[in-house]
Curated annotation (Swiss-Prot):
The active site is at 334 (nucleophile). GO terms for molecular function: 4 iron, 4 sulfur cluster binding; iron ion binding; rRNA (uridine-C5-)-methyltransferase activity. S-adenosyl-L-methionine binds at residues 212, 241, 262, 307. InterPro entries: 23SrRNA_MeTrfase_RlmC (IPR011825), MeTrfase_TrmA_AS (IPR030390), MeTrfase_TrmA_CS (IPR030391), SAM-dependent_MTases_sf (IPR029063), U5_MeTrfase_fam (IPR010280). It catalyses: uridine(747) in 23S rRNA + S-adenosyl-L-methionine = 5-methyluridine(747) in 23S rRNA + S-adenosyl-L-homocysteine + H(+). This is 23S rRNA (uracil(747)-C(5))-methyltransferase RlmC. It comes from Salmonella schwarzengrund (strain CVM19633). Keywords: 4Fe-4S, Iron, Iron-sulfur, Metal-binding, Methyltransferase, rRNA processing, S-adenosyl-L-methionine, Transferase. Its EC number is 2.1.1.189. One of its GO terms (biological process) is rRNA base methylation.
């Protein structure tokens, strides 16, 4: 992928950009084989790639500069700003949004936050696009609620320029730290969730719910999990760390009993909305800690699907799964190193299938899906 920002030495986020996508995929596949050394794998499925550019559905922009000339991008460690509006990972549809937002910031009087001086209001812009209908969600991350009245007053102009903005919020992040968002979310539109659809499954994106940033590859990941579960005798399933329910909603059938657990209430609200649209009455989603939920249950499902953050599921949950001994475990991971550690804590399971998904091109990161069967 050609990138003017990389060529100019202004951005090094895509550290593997000089390698072809095939070379990247080969290196990632070799890394996964290395991490699973000593763990017999019955079936290595072909690695799945995707587009090398314009694939991201989300932009996270630090706002710097002045209110008259704001700059969207990132800050180097020395505080030097870099404009990332031309990043080739973003779809072409983002450019007109960035262009309209620059004069809007002046209209609304949203002074960019100055890290060195600890002054200003606008810290970040978070933009998400739906691949389903092109609708967008825009979040203004502010230091305080001081400029909310001005922001609301200026919004009609912005919405006239950008009718694709379906959900607009102000997130309040008062702490002087590199934290992307705060706990308080103030909706500035009637619509509060962005509609998305993968493989004919309705999904919803809310401001504080995690959603994969590479829709093309994510849809194939969910479809693969659905196909694997469809070949197994599963009538009762848990979906732990379920997020907005992508895995569970793909895998569920009208006859299946499924419980999805996720700590974030916003994500659970999305999952419940999707289940209602699909008419799946035996799906139950709850906002709980996944480990605490699992270890408090007395019944054993046929299959447990886990999709933890980078730290993995950890030894306590591994030990409980080993004791509970469901017939099948599907492990989706964005960190194969912690996944391999967790699998080694499940000695009574064999690896039936493994498949790598290149969710993060031009970096060393990837997603992996693993099917474990009880011995």
């Amino acid at each position: 992928m050609q990138c003017a920002l990389y060529d100019a030495g202004r951005c090094r986020s895509c550290q593997w950009i000089t390698q072809s996508v095939n070379e990247q995929l080969s290196a990632k596949t070799a890394d996964l084989h290395r991490l699973l050394t000593g763990l017999p794998v019955e079936q290595w499925c072909a690695s799945i790639g995707g587009p090398e550019q314009h694939f991201r559905n989300k932009a996270k922009m630090v706002v710097s500069g002045s209110v008259e000339k704001p700059l969207f991008g990132m800050l180097h460690r020395d505080g030097t700003p870099v404009d990332l509006c031309g990043c080739p990972l973003y779809p072409a549809s983002f450019a007109p949004v960035f262009s309209a937002l620059k004069p809007f910031i002046a209209r609304a009087g949203l002074t960019p936050y100055n890290v060195a001086r600890k002054r200003g209001e606008l810290k970040y812009l978070l933009l998400t696009e739906s691949q389903f209908d092109g609708g967008m969600m825009l979040r203004f991350v502010l230091r305080s609620e001081t400029k909310l009245t001005q922001l609301r007053a200026a919004l009609p102009w912005l919405r006239a320029q950008l009718p694709q903005l379906r959900v607009i919020t102000a997130n309040i992040q008062p702490v002087h730290m590199a934290i992307m968002e705060g706990e308080t979310e103030i909706y500035l539109t009637d619509q509060q969730a962005l509609a998305e659809r993968f493989n004919d499954v309705p999904l919803w994106i809310r401001p504080q719910s995690f959603f994969q940033t590479n829709p093309t590859v994510a849809s194939r990941l969910y479809a693969t999990a659905r196909d694997w579960v469809g070949q197994l005798p599963v009538r009762h399933m848990w979906d732990l760390f379920c997020g907005v329910g992508g895995f569970g909603l793909h895998c569920a059938t009208p006859q299946m009993q499924l419980t999805g657990i996720e700590i974030a209430p916003e994500a659970i609200a999305c999952a419940k909305q999707s289940a209602a649209e699909l008419g799946l009455t035996r799906l139950h989603f709850q906002a709980l800690d996944s480990t605490q939920f699992a270890t408090a249950q007395g019944e054993t499902p046929d299959l447990v699907l886990v999709n933890p953050p980078r730290r993995g599921i950890g030894k306590p949950l591994c030990d409980y799964l080993a004791q509970m001994a469901p017939r099948f475990i599907i492990y989706s991971s964005c960190n194969a190193q912690t996944m391999a550690q967790d699998i080694r804590h499940l000695p009574n399971y064999r690896i039936q299938s493994v498949q790598l998904f290149d969710m993060f091109p031009h970096t060393a990161h990837y997603e992996v899906l693993t099917l474990l069967c009880r011995l």
